Amino acid sequence: MEVLSRSEHQNNGRVAKGAPSVAAPLRPAVSSFWDLHAYACVRSTNELVKEALRQGVPEGYCATALEQEGGYGRQGRVWASPLGGVYTSFALRPSVPPQMLPTLSLVASLAVADALERVRSSCNPLIKWPNDVLCSEGKLAGISLEALAGGVCVGVGVNVYEPFAKREVEGKYSLAYLQDGVVEAGLSAEQRTVMTQVVESMLEAMECRYGRWLQEGFSAFIDEYSQRFAYRDKRASLALINGDETIEGIIRGVDGLGRLLVENDVGIVVPMSSGEVHVTSLQR
């Protein structure tokens, strides 16, 4: 894949048919850690970053777009990506034990939640384990993590403004938006400013936490995660991913490997990874 200079990104990527006209990609100001590539519309920022990883780019390579034609989230689920959101993926190459790698997605969720709260202090984002970001019980942002080619692609989709065309989301959560207002025939100057702030704040928060995670592991973030944890001390039903069995219990938190701590009916706390179970329902 050809790696373009910053000035060459204006029209890279295919524009979706019938999509609103977008004058230009965002132009966030970020630290030298990030090699930022900004686009108006692409098929998938994840695919761009994954191809870059295969080509051997160093960590910090980052792609951000205002629209995607083929965006996806965890476990390949479709992530609708119309104008109104910000879709960002970045490459990291952490040298850590394999069991530590899944916790990077939890660290990313903390970075995204913190960044969005900086942009809008009243949104009070919470985290749905392992790594979705909620606001007022609606899905505000989704995060994916894929390991390949000696590195990791972290993808983040944020609902900033409501798109003109209504869309549906998989799962039991409705959609939430960071800001009031609807995107109709393109982005206003104010909307572009806010979306630029989202990317800048998110990458700044991620860079800071990534460095700490490399040195201290996820244990250094457990208290922060607990403060934003939407499930704490709630009774839940959990389904095994590779079977039909359902587990009932009270969610007590997460451990240093990012596993959900579930107290069963006899008082035993059992750790469960996101590769083993997913939460199907909560008692409010």
Name each region found by the language model:
Residues M1-R120, L282:
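N-terminal lobe of the biotin/lipoate ligase/transferase fold
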Residues E2-K17, S21, V96-P98, P102, ...:
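Long, positively charged amphipathic alpha-helical accessory segments at protein N-termini or as interdomain linkers
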